[in-house]
Amino acid sequence: MKKSALLLFVCFIASCATMAPPQISRMAFPENEYQNLAKSGSAVVKGQAFLKTRGGDVKMAAGNDVILNPVTSYSNEWYEKYYIQSKPLVEPDSRVWNYVIRTVADGSGRFIFKNVPAGQYFVTTFVTWEAPTDYGGALQVQGGTVTKRITVNEGDEIEVIVTH
């Protein structure tokens, strides 16, 4: 009897656990598409990344990485499936990081990229903060990824606001 009760209890607890949704595989890395991207340029991209809370507070991307990800079939897949449809994707092919330009946002969520090649990019960062819940003072992470698609021409100096 005790073994049956224990087994029933374990099964009940296991059924309460939430499972993460399965990750969606990505397309094959389009190496030729990436190899054809310009490696250097003269444009400047600067801007600010933030989110507003429901209460109207502004939360900055202070200290977070900001990336310029060239628009390709591979990054478009990420944009459509992950950013728009909120579907979990497997980790990207590590070769993609050779083509992404990175910087760090300052304390006001401002960022700047120099010597950017002409092309289309996703400017992407994370803006997150913790807020109290109704569960004994526990904190919950809020916010998330923000991204904006931009077009950069040679010699441009453009200002971008990245938010929802």
Q: PLM features: residue spans?
A:
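Short, acidic Ser/Thr/Gly-rich low-complexity loop/linker segments typical of extracellular
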Residues: 79-80, 84-108
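Structural detector for hydrophobic anchor residues on beta-strands
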Residues: 45, 101-103, 123
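A short, solvent-exposed beta-strand micro-motif common in secreted/extracellular proteins
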Residues: 119-133
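Sec-dependent N-terminal signal peptides
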Residues: 6-9
